[in-house]
Amino acid sequence: MWERREIKKQGKRQFLRNWAAMIAVCFLLAFTGAEFAQSADFIGQFNPAAVLPDDQVVIQEVSLSNWELLLEWLHIDPMDGTHPMWAAAGQSVGPLFDTLTAPFSAFFALLERSDFAGWLDILLACAGIAGGVWFSVWVLSALTVGARRFFLESRVRDNISIAAMFTPFYRGNWWNVTKGMLLRSVYMILWTCTIIGFPVKLYAYRMVPYILAENPQAKPTEAIQLSRQMMNGNKWRCFVLDLTLYLHWAFLPTLLASILGTGIGMLTGRIVLCQSIATVAVGLLSLLFVNGYKSAAYTALYAALRQAQRDADAPLSSLFTVPAFGEAAPTGA
């Protein structure tokens, strides 16, 4: 039975051994929008009003999400009480839609233009939406699996190249990997129609990218079944692991930075500047440490669950094709 403390310890150890490559991989994931996209938000959140006196009025533009831009273009107001279905969808489908279309957010900006008119703009916007979905399904999903392969390999050997994250593309397994991730996404979208099912299945299907990373030739349905099998009895414990990592490395740093930024800003008379610096500091912490550390910790969790399946000679454990991924990680830093 795995313990949270040991999982975190292994994650830190793995990060310290390959920190440069891990930072590079996580940065690529954030830059493309495959994962950790929120970690780079601070780049565009530095307040330009920070260079002005705090008592000067500055009019700032309110940024809308891709989902909100789409509803605005369709003239749908989910808050007016006449569209309860759209209001409910915004809570579940909205964030998923924003994630899938993140790489092509620029096209959604067309929807916000005051002079938006003409079929050309409409076609461009539709092409942007279709392109964003295509890019997310067929490219970003493979990058996500490739990143899992990188972290699995970096767990058992040093000096791993970031080229490992591109293995789904150049080893002839791209089609099967993307099919598996697409099937997982379809299941998740269907489960959003339920209240309790979605968070449960979110954890049940969590190991699918790792399974496909280890065995890119695994059948999508078998990868999903094996993930459910691995997470059986571990969903709550995994949720607690997520919660502790969030509290320790997201909530508390943000809260502390906010308090320090506001306090120092009040003392110096530059509240906006200090708060902006605090936001950048938290963002850099995520990019330079937290993302890599958490990814390494989740890789250690997969290795522990994988070993438990092998020890029990569980069904579908034959899908684990790389024995080294089940070995104990090196202890040296």
Where are these regions (language model features)?
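Hydrophobic alpha-helical membrane segments
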Residues: 1-333
